[in-house]
Amino acid sequence: MMKQVKFKLPLRMFAFIFGLLLSISAFAQQNTVKGNVKDASGEPIMGATITANGKTIGITDMDGNFVVNATPGTELTITYLGMSPKKIAASANMTITMNDDEKMLNEVVVIGYGVAKKNDLTGSVTAIKPDEKNRGLVTNAQDMISGKIAGVNVVSSSGEPGSGAFIRIRGGSSLNASNDPLIVIDGLAMDNQGVKGLSNPLSMVNPNDIESFTVLKDASATAIYGSRGSNGVIIITTKKGRAGSAPKVSYNGNVSASIVKKYMDVLNGDEYRALVGKLYGTGSSRYALLGNANTDWQKEIYRTAISSDHNVTVQGGLKNLPYRFSIGYTGQDGILKTSNFQRTTASVNVNPSLMDDHLKFNINGKFMYAQNRYAKTDAIGNAIGFDPTQPITSSDPKFKRFNGYWQWVQNSPATFDKSWPYSKIALAGSNPVSLLEANDDRSHAYDYMGNVEVDYQIHGFEDLRLHMNFSGDWSNGNKEQNVEPWSPSNFYYGYHKYDTENKYNLNYTAYLQYYKDFLKNQHFDVMGGYEWRHEKYWGNYNDYGIHPAGADAGKRYNEQKSEWKSEHYLVSFYGRMNYSLLDRYMLTATFRADGSSRFAKGHKWGYFPSAAFGWKVNEEAFMKNIKSISELKFRLGWGMTGQQEGIGDYQYFATYQQPTETQALYPAAGNGYQYIPEPYNPDLKWETTITYNAGIDFALAKNILSGSIDVYHRKTKDLLMAAPVAAMSNFGNRVTKNVGELENTGVEGSLTVRPIRTADWQWEITGNVTYNKNKVVKLAGDGQPIPYGDIGLGTGSTAMCHQEGQPIGSFWVYQQVYDKDGKPLQGVVVDRDANGVIDDNDRYYYKSSIAPWLFGLSSRLQYKSWDFGFSLRASVGNYVFNKNKMAYRSPEFIGSGSGFMSNTTPYANKVNFKLSDKTYDALTDYFVENASFLKCDNITLGYSFENLFKGANYKGLSGRVYATASNVFTITKYDGLDPEVSAAKPDGSKPDVAGGIDNVIYPRPLSLLLGVSLNF
């Protein structure tokens, strides 16, 4: 009875609300036929759809019964999720039995070096197909999986057009080496090192070409990739044509407008003048520096950005030759003026089949060309702090050499060029508009990717297959930056830089696979293979200024040049064995041996085994009478993976570097250089990760509810880290060593619910939750802490630290003391060691920037031709050091400089700190804020149509129109602009292992999009 109440109530509610719409067809004058639909066991099927001539005419009720208007003899089609469609001629009283859809049950999932039946997987593997009807503004492939997969956290680097993302699967596995997952695109394993203009491997593929994502999360699934699988694997399969299908042309395009979602709260011109008058007096020299304008600098640097995306596809197939061709263009303006991203992509895929389908080819080719115009992001911080009483431009002669832009200037030194009588005050902020306009920073990047897969099912030995894959990727990136001599950042000489980077990776893999079913209820397959990989990088740069006047006019100033190259090889042997008994008990074992050129003799080879067991409990005899359980499978897995990324190619032997500084010339002012030895370690070896995983897959009530739960523990040892060494013991104060251990323990779950499936209504809700707890178990030597997370206050101003026993991303701060009203007392922190002296020993570990809890929720509701969807994402328990709050903690900072003024925020008046040279004023837990959030990534409303313009010789036009809002809202307690802080650094250097410092990145915009999909 509970089962009936659960299903019947929502159906009645929707019938009541939408009864008129659902009953219109009841007035049609046709004959009435009745029937009953059940499954093979005799259980009634509720929610089966009945169609005639392509039109839905009914749906079964709670008892599997239906009544429809149809002429006897009319062909009816009955469909139900998870079962094979059934066609039957209409008659007075029908009893229809539906069978399980073997194709769906045996749906294959792409895994490492092969495919597997989804129902037979023993590892933690999630496969999804992008939801074409419920997605927001998508520029890169990572946008399609954000918040969609349990255990996968995607944080975009910024809101800059074409920017990349930080992807972490189950929290990452390293402190210093790479935490990026391995990306595999159509069998080609990509490297994670980009070139100028390419943010990451996911930016190299057109999102509209993607057929599916498969994410391998535990070591039993990833160990087949050995040294590259420690951080998980994301396998991308692109779309293909279908054999024997007619040519089909389709178009998908959209236009969007993006705006700034939130501005930093700062004083306007009138408020600022009032504050300066209050602090210093209206007759003071500081007040005299103020202007008469009321400039909102943030609104001067931002704009409404218009973007568009267009894709054309042709696909089809001859009898033995499926094909697909596509071309795409993305043009995206950034909300920060002058920024722009353009990308052109093309792809071709053909899949010829020969020799009675024994010999199959999969040939892929992809091309991408990207252009970037980078805005000077320093303008963002300067727009917050620049004096709002000053104008953007001025006709005053003192600003002539600044192209008329107002700046804080001073008299140039007597020895300086007399034709440049004024120069910018070095410590003062810069006019943010001039920073943007003076900077022309562009990149051009090309990427060519392709592979040829050959699969041969050997004649006479059909159980034996030979598979080979020849693949390669070549990229070239060129970046040119020209800064005008009137720029406040490169005054007088200007700045010119030319930067070129190239890379390629070649990959060859071959394996033999043997399949055998025997004794009717046992299956065995074994695979063994070899892989060879070569990655090479090379490039150069040249930067200089130009003398604008005088005897050296036109000559280069302070020119620096450099060339570099690097390469490494990886040779591997691997194998996998699968055994199943009674299609119920499954065992999988893998082994891989990797040999890397990055390690010395004796350490080159790493060995990575795994094993997993699966049990389909629902296939047991004692479960046969429990009809409410459609699937119940237990999984257990163990495996070992490795790591060699993020350490460079030559750190195990002695190398020398040519310095670029003029003081290194030999002899003094000569043409020679003194080469500097680099630190090295011949004992480097593989970083290894061991993972244990237990999981449950389930489906209830004929797949109305389905999901999975996984519990895991992962421990990484021999961490590759830059560890301190004793003085004079090497050629630096730090050297890469194998030291330390790291643990991740977690639980993740996903759930899909289909509460409504009627003739006109379909509703699907998908959610996921992840809990991950990490801990640094051991560090180098005596466990000395490793500080990081600079907040820009000079030596020692790091707000984060790695320490044994603490989670990654821990803040290392002083404990703030408050008054009775909860207001922080300036300079009063807890003396934790009670020695009367405040120093680093009084800092403590407080919270973490990494959220232990992650949530994702997607919903798609469809009514006839209409669809409505949204995606939510939440992060709970993550904290952020609010650097902006720290920087504006005192209103007195507005006049702290000599000859210039700076703006501030209303917050500064609330805290009202005084000027101080004590670093611990700023390094307190007061500035570490709870940054938990709930975000709505997108809301979409669409309408699908078909048979438009249908004619005698034309089947008509089908398609969909839709409207989407992206990055719609954020609910958070965090005071900053955005609680989602990435690990990217403002200077573009190597990101920290965990974000946590709010550096006022390029803001993520709110975007409104109109799109159309057409099938001709």
Q: Each PLM stretch: what is its role?
A:
Residues M2-M368, K376-T377, W420, K424, ...:
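Short, small/polar-rich motifs associated with maturation and membrane association
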Residues G187, G805-V813, D819:
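Extended ligand-binding clefts on enzyme/binding-domain cores
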Residues S848-F881:
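Glycine-rich, aromatic-lined ligand/substrate-binding cores of catalytic
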Residues K133, D180, R273, Y280, ...:
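Extracellular/periplasmic, surface-exposed regions of secreted and cell-surface proteins
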Residues N31, V37-K38, T60, I183, ...:
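Hydrophobic alpha-helical segments, especially N-terminal targeting/anchoring helices
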Residues N835:
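Acidic carboxylate motifs that coordinate Ca2+ or other divalent cations, activating on Asp/Glu
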Residues I50, I78, I183, Y579, ...:
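Short aromatic-centered micro-motifs
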Residues Q142-S146, R734-E743, G783-F811, Y845-G856, ...:
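C-terminal extracellular loops and terminal segments
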